[in-house]
Each structure stands twice: as C-alpha cells, then as structure tokens.
C-alpha cells in the first residue's frame, strides 16, 4: 500500500486545516472524561464495601441488613458528588476555552 502525503492528496492545492489546537483540547477533554468515569465506577463501589464492613458493621455494630441500607446511601451520595464535580469541571473548562477563543 502506498503512503500518501497531504500535498499529493490535495489536488486542488487548497490549504488543509490544522487541528493542533483542537487536538490538545480534545485530549484534555478525554482525559477529564476518563478520570471521572473511573472515579464514578471505583469510588461508590469502594465506599459501599468499606463503609459497610468497617464503619457500619465494625464501628457502629449494625446488623448485616442495616449496614446494606446505609452503605447504599453512602454510595448514592458518592455518585452525586462525583457528578457534581464533573459538571463543575466541565463547566469551567468550557468557559475557559470559550474565553480563550474569544480573545483570539
């Protein structure tokens, strides 16, 4: 298979757009999304089991049934905190990119 460069593919000699600024923005956005995706999965599950075993059953001496209930509440609160953090970061990232684009 032959390798083609930009000049040979651009027969009309129209300048090709460069996406280097957008690619950096896209990579940063994907890193943020990946971070919050991992956090959304790991934090509630980890808090559920650790709070069930160590806090509710270990420290407070609750029954198995009660500890399930309260650990689920802790996990749901953790999900909402992660979602709120994601919205905050995404909002600030979008407004920062908008301000940088407006100044150009």
Swiss-Prot record:
This is Vacuolar ATPase assembly integral membrane protein vma21. It is found in: Endoplasmic reticulum membrane; Endoplasmic reticulum-Golgi intermediate compartment membrane; Cytoplasmic vesicle, COPII-coated vesicle membrane. It is a multi-pass membrane protein. Pfam families: VMA21 (PF09446). Residues 47-68 are lumenal. Its main location: endoplasmic reticulum. One of its GO terms (cellular component) is ER to Golgi transport vesicle membrane. It comes from Xenopus tropicalis. GO terms for biological process: vacuolar proton-transporting V-type ATPase complex assembly. Required for the assembly of the V0 complex of the vacuolar ATPase (V-ATPase) in the endoplasmic reticulum. The chain crosses the membrane at residues 26-46, 69-89.
